[in-house]
């Protein structure tokens, strides 16, 4: 990756255990990816019923289906890495056990209705339980309000896009990661293509990796242009490109022309090393009957390009 060198994880015994469980063959360093496209694929994970349930969960019009775990959904898609999003910290070791079969795991550290302090504490707790945990994800970090935060850098006051925890707490979180897990945990932050003003640049400079998403299907028509705008804010930043398989902004199945376009652009950006990989959204979409066309297209695309290598 571009921002800093990959460092190996400590704890040979723990990693040895990871190797024995991992169907994708965990190596000595979770932050070192192999040269195949598949190894650079992630999947955004939610428990079943989060987006495809009843009541508030039905707002996006996603059809109901039988439950499927995040690791099982990833296995179906042929994806080795998962970003787990659980707003209530899991208490059961039995729940966590299947995640040990993934090559890499990241866990949500911000967003939802739970406090940042609760979610951060859970991330640190999980480090002792998941030897393949290598990322803390700031989901829904920004509040996307028009009035910026005024932050005193000590050399002057700057305008920063408003967030759920504030810029000072973000910097403190960065310091804690550097002190407790330097080179072993990536701090990762979500940003959407709809919000690319200059005030977002100070926050985007803090994480190791940015997760770039296009919420509304029709906006994928301008994916290249929007990604270029993002790059102007965060040049050289390690970036995973989010691949939605449902039109959440439109609350409907994703138009297949847009699905094909976003994967064509994603492949182009990846091969040019403008992005580091992909995040497919999301695990509750995987087991629909009939299957969602965008999901099956993505699955076939991953299989087709799994062994692609960049020059």
Language-model segments: which ranges?
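N-terminal export signals
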Residues: 5-25
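Glycan-processing catalytic domains of CAZymes
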Residues: 29-311
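N-terminal secretory signal peptides
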Residues: 1-2
């Amino acid at each position: 990756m571009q921002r800093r060198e990959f460092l190996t994880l400590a704890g040979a015994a723990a990693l040895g255990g990871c190797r024995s469980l991992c169907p994708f063959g965990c190596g000595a360093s979770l932050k070192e990816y192999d040269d195949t496209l598949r190894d650079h694929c992630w999947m955004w994970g939610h428990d079943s019923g989060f987006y495809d349930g009843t009541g508030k969960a039905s707002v996006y019009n996603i059809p109901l289906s039988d439950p499927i775990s995040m690791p099982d959904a990833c296995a179906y898609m042929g994806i080795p890495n998962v970003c787990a999003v659980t707003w209530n910290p899991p208490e059961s070791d039995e729940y966590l056990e299947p995640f040990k079969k993934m090559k890499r795991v990241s866990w949500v550290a911000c967003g939802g209705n739970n406090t940042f302090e609760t979610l951060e504490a859970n991330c640190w707790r999980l480090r002792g339980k998941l030897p393949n945990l290598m990322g803390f994800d700031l989901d829904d970090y920004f509040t996307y309000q028009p009035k910026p935060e005024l932050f005193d850098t000590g050399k002057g006051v700057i305008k920063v896009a408003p967030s759920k925890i504030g810029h000072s707490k973000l910097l403190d979180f960065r310091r804690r990661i550097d002190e407790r897990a330097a080179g072993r945990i990536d701090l990762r932050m979500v940003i959407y293509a709809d919000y690319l003003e200059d005030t977002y640049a100070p926050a985007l400079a803090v994480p190791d990796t940015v997760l770039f998403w296009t919420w509304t299907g029709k906006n994928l028509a301008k994916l290249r242009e929007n990604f270029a705008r993002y790059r102007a804010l965060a040049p050289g930043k390690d970036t995973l490109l989010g691949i939605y398989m449902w039109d959440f902004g439109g609350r409907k199945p994703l138009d297949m022309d847009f699905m094909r376009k976003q994967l064509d652009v994603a492949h182009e950006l990846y091969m040019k090393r403008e992005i580091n990989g992909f995040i497919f959204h999301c695990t509750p979409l995987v087991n629909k009957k009939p299957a969602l066309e965008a999901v099956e297209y993505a699955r076939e695309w991953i299989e087709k390009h799994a062994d692609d290598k960049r020059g």
